[in-house]
C-alpha cells in the first residue's frame, strides 16, 4: 500500500447471514411449558381437581371408603402441582422466557407422570366403586351416588388435561 | 511413463472412513421394538396378563362385579396385543431387521398407550373394590379376596411392563 496516496475505498459489507450455526430444534407447540396453551392446560387441571376435591369432601361418609380418601389425597396433590406449574408458566410468559432447560423439563416430565398416574388411579378406583354401588348392588338410595359420580368425572377430566402436558413435555425432552 | 519399462508400484489404498454422511440417530436401547429387551418385555406383559385373566376367571362370581368383568376384557386385549408384538419382535430379531418405520412406530405407540391405559384402569378399579371388600366392609369370608388380590396384582405387573415399552417407543418416535 502506498502511504502517500491514502484512499478509502468503499467496500461492500459481507453478507450477514451467519445464522449462528442453526440447530435443528422443534418449534413451540401450544401446550408445552412456557406457552399460553400450557398455562390454559395447567389452569384446567387445577380447576377440575379442586372441583373433584370439593365435591368428594362435601359427602359426609367418603372417609368410610379407602378409594374415596385416596381420591381426595390425589386431587390435593394434583391441585398443588398444577398450581405451581401454572405460576411458573405465567411467570415465563410475563418475562418472555423459554422453559427449555434440560433439568427443568425432566423435572416437569417426572412430576406430570407421577401426578397423572396417581389422579388416574384414584379416578378409576372411585369409578369402580361408584359402578359397584350404583349398578351392581343398587344401593344409591343410601349413598350419594350423584356426588361420587361427579367427583369421579371431574378427576377424570383433570387427568385428561394432565396427559397432553405430560406427552408434550416428554416429546420436548426426547426431541432436544 | 516409459512403456518399455513397466513396473507395478504398490500404492496404499486410500483411507476408507467415508462414513456415508452419518445422521444423528439414537442408538437402540434395550426395550425398544426389535430388540431382545423389547421381546422380553412383550413376553412378560403377555404372561402376567394371561395369569391375571386365568385367576379372575377361576372365581365363579366375578361376573357380578362390573370392574372384574372389565379386568377380564382388558387383560384379554392386553394378551392379544402383547402376543402380536412379541411375534413381530421375534421376527425382526430373526431376520435382523430394524423396526424404524415411522408409521409402524406410531402404530406401536398408539397401541401401547391404549392397552396400557385400559389395563391400568382395570387394575385400579379392581384394586379399589378389593380394598373395599377386604378392608372397609370386611367381607372376605364370603368372597375370594385372595384371588381378586392376586389377579389385580398380576394386572398391575402387566401394566408395569407395558409402560417402559410405551415410553421407549414414544421416545424413539420423538427423537427421530
UniProtKB/Swiss-Prot annotation, chains A, B:
GO terms for cellular component: plasma membrane. Residues 1-35, 89-102, 174-176 are cytoplasmic. The chain crosses the membrane at residues 36-56, 68-88, 103-123, 153-173. Disulfide bonds: none annotated. InterPro entries: CASP_dom, CASPL-5. It comes from the Eukaryota. It is found in: Cell membrane. Keywords: Cell membrane, Membrane, Transmembrane, Transmembrane helix. It is a multi-pass membrane protein. Residues 57-67, 124-152 are extracellular. Homodimer and heterodimers. Belongs to the Casparian strip membrane proteins (CASP) family. This is CASP-like protein 5A1. It comes from Ginkgo biloba.
Amino acid at each position: 500500500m502506498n502511504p502517500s496516496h491514502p484512499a478509502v475505498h468503499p467496500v461492500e459489507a459481507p453478507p450477514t447471514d451467519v445464522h449462528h450455526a442453526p440447530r435443528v430444534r422443534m418449534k413451540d407447540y401450544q401446550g408445552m411449558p412456557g406457552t399460553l396453551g400450557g398455562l390454559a392446560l395447567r389452569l384446567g387441571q387445577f380447576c377440575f381437581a379442586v372441583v373433584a376435591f370439593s365435591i368428594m369432601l362435601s359427602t359426609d361418609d367418603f372417609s368410610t371408603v379407602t378409594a374415596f380418601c385416596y381420591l381426595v389425597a390425589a386431587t390435593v396433590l394434583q391441585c398443588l402441582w398444577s398450581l405451581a406449574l401454572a405460576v411458573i408458566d405465567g411467570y415465563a410468559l410475563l418475562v418472555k422466557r423459554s422453559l427449555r432447560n434440560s433439568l427443568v423439563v425432566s423435572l416437569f416430565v417426572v412430576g406430570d407422570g407421577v401426578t397423572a398416574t396417581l389422579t388416574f388411579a384414584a379416578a378409576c378406583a372411585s369409578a369402580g366403586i361408584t359402578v359397584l354401588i350404583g349398578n351392581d348392588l343398587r344401593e344409591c338410595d343410601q349413598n350419594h351416588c350423584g356426588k361420587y359420580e361427579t367427583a369421579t368425572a371431574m378427576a377424570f377430566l383433570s387427568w385428561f388435561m394432565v396427559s397432553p402436558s405430560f406427552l408434550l413435555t416428554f416429546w420436548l425432552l426426547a426431541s432436544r
